[in-house]
Regions:
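Short helix/loop capping segments that flank catalytic or ligand/cofactor-binding pockets
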Residues: 4, 82-85, 178-180
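Extended oligomerization regions of viral-like shell subunits
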Residues: 40-173
């Protein structure tokens, strides 16, 4: 580090922080997904009515067991593509890109766009995560959230290694998760 360009060290630290963030994201989504026992079937992911039925069935299960409704829908990039491109029996998008030319959003059960992961299928906040092992929805916001994730980033740490006249650099932090109530979540299968 004594002879390193500060800009190159900054690049390395940024890459370590990104790797740390991906690892904690993967931990959180895997832990949440593994604890969910309720399921709702999407018969055909290309059929809009099947998505609508699965989302409402999941909402029914969550409401029946907890008296809450889902707030978020977590999907893989593959499920996001299937959901956003699903059509009704008239070949109209179920979740259209609002504001597109010649598309007034009639029949809109939410919206989606190919240039953003933002969307709101049936009013749910859409979260697209490549680390998700599968798609699910749940009551994930507010004081009664069913799943909690805590993280404290400690940042970079370095240790001199005299034997090699070098220095080891790492990025560290603490992460913990807690499934407070698995009945507030439903997996899509």
């Amino acid at each position: 580090m004594d002879w390193s360009d500060p800009a190159s060290i900054d690049i390395i630290l940024n890459q370590l922080a990104i790797a740390y963030g991906q690892a904690t994201d993967n931990y959180a989504v895997d832990t949440c997904h593994a604890a969910i026992t309720q399921t709702s079937s999407v018969a055909d992911t290309a059929v809009g009515a099947d998505w609508v039925a699965a989302i409402y069935e999941g909402a029914r299960q969550i409401s029946l067991n907890t008296n809450y409704l889902p707030t978020h829908m977590f999907v893989t990039p593959g499920s996001w593509a299937a959901l956003a491109s699903s059509v009704d029996d008239q070949n109209r998008p179920v979740f259209p890109f609002v504001g597109a030319p010649n598309l007034m959003g009639q029949n809109a059960a939410g919206n989606a766009a190919a240039n953003t992961w933002n969307g709101n299928p049936l009013g749910l906040v859409l979260v697209v995560d490549k680390n998700a092992p599968g798609s699910f929805m749940g009551h994930a916001a507010g004081p009664a959230a069913g799943f909690e994730f805590y993280e404290q980033q400690k940042g970079a740490i370095s240790v001199d290694v005299p034997a090699t006249l070098g220095r080891t650099i790492a990025f560290r932090g603490y992460a913990a998760s807690f499934m407070a109530d698995a009945t507030k979540f439903v997996k899509f299968v």
